[in-house]
Amino acid sequence: MMLLGLAIGEQAKGQEYPWSLQYITNMQVLNPAFVGMWDKSGLMVSTRTNWVGINGAPLSQYAGYFTPVKDQHSGVGLSIQRLNTGLEKRLSLSGDYSFQVRLDMYNYLRFGLRAGILNYDNNLSNYQLYPDHIPDPEFNPDVRFYNMTTFGAGAVFFNEDYFISISVPQVINNSFKVNRNNFSASIYNPKTAYLSGSYIFSLVNGVHLRPNLLVVGTIGKPIYLDLATIAYLPINLQVGINLRTTGSVCFSAQYTFKNKMRIGYASDYAVISDIRKYQVGTYEFVIGYELDNGRRKYN
């Protein structure tokens, strides 16, 4: 039964909502209120490999489409996300809706809702006991193709210079029972809240600097911080660095082509965590495309 805690307990009960290393320029992944905030429609795909060097480490892939409607007072989006950890597989399909309220001449408040379906699959009979490498009879039958509802919400206050965002991407505790021992597991439990704030400073020669603070709070776990800064250069290049209180540092870069396609890369390295000696980092690639010219600052 030792592997049960590893295969399901830690991943199913202790895992936060999957989010991008380059979340600052892809805030719609964390907060549905950002969907449709831009001037035109957009597409984004990404892939992230966690903890390279560890067999069965998380692999996540994401694809999304977002567009404003009704003169940008509201927006809609559709996304699909896959997360594989060991033999555990999660596939989610979500729809987002956001609407905007103008507070005064300069300030806006935007709200967002997210709803979807999560498919969960875990081939327990293929897990093997160490060191004998034989199947555990307690893992029979498998957890196969459970479909569950997902729901999230968020809000963002913003103007041309800064934003303050808060969201809970998944607020529903989905549970199910497996095998003859009535083992139960929960998906995305406990809930995780994300509070983020960012300000854009205009420097010389067309350079802009954007510091960002992300506070991540999960019930039953310590609060941790992500401190980041992105520099926007006039050559359509942006570079960034993130420092996390969990003991890791992230470097990122993103380039926007003249046809409005953007390509981003990020690498995350553990610097004080015990896991550092077993892996060589986490890596993420992002490709985005705008269907027309024009884009607001926050994406």
Where are these regions (language model features)?
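Bacterial N-terminal signal peptides
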Residues: M1-A7
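Subset of outer-membrane beta-barrel
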Residues: Q15-N299
